[in-house]
């Protein structure tokens, strides 16, 4: 339908679209957009443009929303993955750390296993060497038996026609043949020795195989191949190693006829100076060349006995032994030493020497299991084990070495220097005790002074120290310890830094410390636990810390300052005893006076006390105890903190104590029960501990310090009585003062001491005891020699193996006075000694001639040593002049004893006069005055000088004048 307008214009009517109801809204979204030529009916309006724009905006917004959601989802996924990765990384790191620790432990166990294998190898080698020596001895003895039988038969046949009585004697040729075959069989047994191989210290260890089947082969055959041992190889026979010729190689010479002059020349050359190495070893001198047995492979089939009696003067073995000891005997001016591949210098002052390995005690020296007591230098080894070099020493004791040492030890002074174990470098030291080392050390120890320096364990760096005790280290230390003074410095555990200290006690550290401890004065400074900072202190006792302390303790005065527990601040104090804190204290304790101040339990305030005895606490006290009086301080029950006191009685604790006791005064300090910390005390009685102690005891004063039970650490003390230990000790005892130091039980390390009485050891000791001062050197009993001079009634024999008489400037052989029961007093032959023994008339340990007054041990071990006690050179000359032909003096001469006792002022005065008249007219008088308290608290000398005098009769002087005429 077409609409016609009412008004007709010039253009005429136009067609118009019929509007619908929805034409008022925007155009459809499907309508096309306008172009330039489409304006008019086809062009959409603005409403349509608005719709298109809104549609596009929604589409773009939806896409942006999808991207945002995806981004958030990826973020959450990243967080989860990162968390899982961190967890896996932590677990892997922990596993790697554990694996690394296992590798380190494996390496340590491997090194320890190698060390033990090498130790076993060396012991096996020493045993094989001893077996070789025993083979040689058996063959020699069999040849001597056969020779003696033939000599007896010849002598009886010669006497048959001229003797009044004739004994029918027939040779049992069948038994002799069996004996000869058995000896030949034993002599032909060949043992292969291990040869040590050095391996690199890495996990990729070089494995060496061994052809050692560890079974003997017969004849001259080769050993059967076998599987080897880790890092060990055996390629050389015992016959190609440095051979071990006995010290007294007999020379069998018939001056009438000489079947083979080269044999005598070869035998004589074995006692001359000779040095060999493993590359060009020297063969042992075979006695088969002088005594070819029937059926043997060497020599002729006839018995050709060239024998020279040992008692005949000339080139016999006695002269060889005398020549070997000429450099060390005071009665011989010659310094020629007789050394071979093995140089056995006995220091016997011209006495007879039995073959090695027999355990025979010799006059002037003990030599058993490689232990040489007194007399110059030696190269004995263990049980006759030889070395390849000569050890030289000068002075009382000289120097020597035991084990597989291949280098020279040199020392001068009393004790010199020595080494034990697999040392390959020399030890050098001068002074009383010198220096030495034990274990697998490969670097030298150098020290001067009483005790010098030494090291134990797997140390690879030298220890250097000067003074009484010097310095040393134990454990896996790899850095040197340096110290000077009495005690010096040392370290235990896994320390890798040096300890330096000077004064009595010096400084040391225990545990995992990595920084040095430095201190000066008596006691110095030290630390225990996980400390990483140094402790510094000066004065008697110095300063130290225990537990998790990370800051230094500093103190000056007797006792200084220290701390226990979780303290993080220093303690400072001055005075006798100083100050310290225990438990969870965070503030310092300060006190001055004898005893100082301290705290127990959970105290947070200081305790202060002054007076004799100081203060103490018992049980669960939280308030301070303060007291003054004679008796000091102590605690009983379940105390876990230290007791400290000063005064008569000192301090001590009983029960389950785990902390140290410290005290000074008469009685010192000690502890019983399951103590695991050290006791320290100074004064009469010193300090000691009983039970399962594992830490050292240190004390100074009359009685020193000692320990009983399963101690494994050294005891150190100075004063009358020195220090010693009993039980299963494996470390050395060192002490200086009257009585020296010694050890009993299964000791395997040396004892060193200086002062009246020297030092010695009893039990199964296998190392050397050395002592200097009145009483000479030391000795060992229980397998290495005879022990004399112990107890209040002593047996003094001129043929004792102890005492170091070769170091005295007296006669080579002292008179045999027989068994002489001396008066029961320890202060005989000592001037102005003060005895602190708990008995009224005699000291514990007894002994005479230089014995300590306060439990001073056995004292000088030979009767002749008493002549060195404060008498001077005039008495020496007088005594030497009154004993011509001393060894021929009779011990059956008459003697008389007169004793008087009186009581005055609470004191018991006992005077004893012992007079002995020898067979040559010599009169020896012993006059002793002993003053002791009547209450049994102790015995004290009144300072009476010994009146040992030698009165020569007219007949004795006449005999001496005749003896001295040309």
UniProtKB/Swiss-Prot annotation:
List the record's Gene Ontology CC terms alphabetically: fibrinogen complex
Q: Which domain of life is it from?
A: Eukaryota
The biased composition feature labelled Gly residues covers: 430-440, 448-458, 466-476, 485-494, 503-512, 539-548, 575-584, 593-602, 611-620, 629-638, 647-656, 682-692, 718-728, 737-746, 755-764, 773-788, 844-857
Q: Which GO terms describe its molecular function?
A: extracellular matrix structural constituent; protein-macromolecule adaptor activity; signaling receptor binding
**Signal peptide as annotated in the record:** 1-5
> Residue ranges under compositional bias (Basic and acidic residues)?
305-321
Q: Name one GO biological process term.
A: platelet aggregation
Location relative to the cell: Secreted
Q: Where is this region: 22 X 18 AA approximate tandem repeats of [FN]-T-G-S-[AG]-[QK]-G-G-S-W-[SG]-T-G-G-[RS]-T-[AE]-[TP]?
A: 391-786
The family database entries (SMART domains) matched by this protein are listed as: Fib_alpha
Q: Per the record, where are the segments of Low complexity compositional bias?
A: 264-286, 322-349, 368-417, 789-804, 887-919
PTM summary: Not glycosylated.
Instruction: Outline the segment boundaries, as ranges, of region: Disordered.
Output: 208-804, 831-857, 885-966
Cite the entry's keywords alphabetically.
Answer: Blood coagulation, Coiled coil, Disulfide bond, Hemostasis, Repeat, Secreted, Signal
Q: Does the keyword tRNA processing apply?
A: no
- For bias type Basic residues, the affected ranges are 951-966
This protein's record includes keyword Ion transport: no
Functional note: Fibrinogen has a double function: yielding monomers that polymerize into fibrin and acting as a cofactor in platelet aggregation.
Domain notes from UniProt? A long coiled coil structure formed by 3 polypeptide chains connects the central nodule to the C-terminal domains (distal nodules). The long C-terminal ends of the alpha chains fold back, contributing a fourth strand to the coiled coil structure.
Protein name from the UniProt record: Fibrinogen alpha-1 chain
**Source organism per UniProt:** Petromyzon marinus (Sea lamprey)
Top-down, what is the taxonomic lineage of the species of origin?
Eukaryota, Metazoa, Chordata, Craniata, Vertebrata
